[in-house]
Amino acid sequence: MTTRKPFIICDFDGTITMNDNIINIMKTFAPPEWMALKDGVLSKTLSIKEGVGRMFGLLPSSLKEEITSFVLEDAKIREGFREFVAFINEHEIPFYVISGGMDFFVYPLLEGIVEKDRIYCNHASFDNDYIHIDWPHSCKGTCSNQCGCCKPSVIHELSEPNQYIIMIGDSVTDVEAAKLSDLCFARDYLLNECREQNLNHLPYQDFYEIRKEIENVKEVQEWLQNKNAGESSLK
């Protein structure tokens, strides 16, 4: 029987980082109107693309440096993430960060941890009076949810047939990707969704837990054994 190669995708805000950076930006800089937009996204009466786009549209572009400095100082990387990335790199397990966040904070926060070509996120433009969001990874094919950064579309683009897909996330932006995964590591909003929709999942608090559980996954164990056997035969 052919071994199913593991393939890991990971959210950024609230998953790799301890808090949701977009929410913290809005709490600090946005006028009160952002709350109704957030509630619309969470209740799914607004698409993620529309809701998040309109939230950032409330912020003057003149705040670029202030917002950037704030989020880079405020964000904290979740415990065990650096070690987790080192583990998957050592064993050559495909790993991508697919984020509904913005390039001006996702890239610098992951610098030196995850290569830029393994990060998919949105682009914030500060060229006009108010921040405008560009969506370079919009929905394709059968997805019509107006995801913004469409995680299902990116998964279809990057993954190969018969891979064992592992999803790590926390929020409403991760639900559709979780439905495509063989195993979802979930917390917060996503954990409740996984329970309600009977998706195969495990809860987590940090990446030490995730690594421990991943090493117990049959497909990962088989991949590591085959890889180690191949390396031994070359010695």
Curated annotation (Swiss-Prot):
Pathway: Amino-acid biosynthesis; L-methionine biosynthesis via salvage pathway; L-methionine from S-methyl-5-thio-alpha-D-ribose 1-phosphate: step 4/6. The keyword Transmembrane helix does not apply. It comes from the Bacteria. GO terms for cellular component: cytoplasm. Its EC number is 3.1.3.87. InterPro entries: HAD-like_hydrolase_phosphatase (IPR050849), HAD-like_sf (IPR036412), HAD-SF_hydro_IB_MtnX (IPR017718), HAD_hydro_PyrdxlP_Pase-like (IPR006384), HAD_sf (IPR023214). One of its GO terms (biological process) is L-methionine salvage from methylthioadenosine. One of its GO terms (molecular function) is 2-hydroxy-3-keto-5-methylthiopentenyl-1-phosphate phosphatase activity. Disulfide bonds: none annotated. Keywords: Amino-acid biosynthesis, Hydrolase, Methionine biosynthesis. It catalyses: 2-hydroxy-5-methylsulfanyl-3-oxopent-1-enyl phosphate + H2O = 1,2-dihydroxy-5-(methylsulfanyl)pent-1-en-3-one + phosphate. Dephosphorylates 2-hydroxy-3-keto-5-methylthiopentenyl-1-phosphate (HK-MTPenyl-1-P) yielding 1,2-dihydroxy-3-keto-5-methylthiopentene (DHK-MTPene). Belongs to the HAD-like hydrolase superfamily. MtnX family. This is 2-hydroxy-3-keto-5-methylthiopentenyl-1-phosphate phosphatase. The lineage of its organism: Bacteria, Bacillati, Bacillota, Bacilli, Bacillales. The gene is mtnX.
